[in-house]
Amino acid sequence: MHAKAQDLQEMAHFISCYGLNTGPQMAYMGPVITFDISALAYVVTEGTTPDVFFTDEVASIQLIEASDRAMACLRAISDVLDSAVCETRTGDGTWVPDYIEHVSNWAATPPIGATEPPTESEVIGRILRAANHAQTHAA
């Protein structure tokens, strides 16, 4: 199986077992640890949970952006969403796709005209769609 597809399937499995964090930080320590969808991509692909995921969103985003495998998963999920990826302006004035913002925002906030964000089942479904697409279109 293609590594990206396997990573995405692991993400879906984790959410089905432990849930999804949609709170202010990338991770939440409750009875079980839950992760924001972007942080979960990092945890699955890198095999570690950085302490900053609980305390520092900016540092968390920088870590996730530095992980090629996590970003590949987030791009794959972004590709199967109904909305276009948003762009963020960098320090030098260039506009770049912001996959972390796109995917995390989609999973944690209600769409226009709705009062609730996607359910965990809907999030899992999109992740599995991305996994299927990654496996089908693997080179």
Segment roles from a protein language model:
Residues 1-21, 25, 41, 46-139:
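Charged interaction scaffolds used for protein-protein
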Residues 31-44:
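Active-site nucleophilic cysteine motif
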